[in-house]
């Protein structure tokens, strides 16, 4: 990652920058992540607070295993962090394909990470991003039971304590369509719970 500041003013304990720029270029396995971000910056070294009042940029993620191969996400929003108090607040907006997404995150502890969030998506067609199901095999292969699915690995979120709400205006999964979907999500102790609070089915589904 590369970070640059321009238009820096202020005293030793408090400074402002007209523009902070961040460039990211990372790779893990087959996944590559490239991005850039720009924002004014306000920092108080004595109080250990940092604020990016208005950032914008984009994030590009590519992996040959993804149905779309690569995804470009425009980003806008703002961030404020209190390093000493271990709190932060983030609001961000992006667009993934035909989905407009707005997120709010409030962090109450950095380590181990604890946060609450709200995620609002206007519409999402999950079927569009899933790989096609293989055609049924013929003859003896057709009579064989399908291989057991591997259990999901939640070890990466073992130390995470998070809760929040996901709202989706229009959702399609396995050709089932629903509107005004509201989900409650909780992650703690390496477990992930997703509970539907409400949803309206439509189009005869």
Residue ranges and their predicted role:
Residues 4-88, 97-195, 199-204:
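Membrane-proximal interfacial segments on either side of biological membranes
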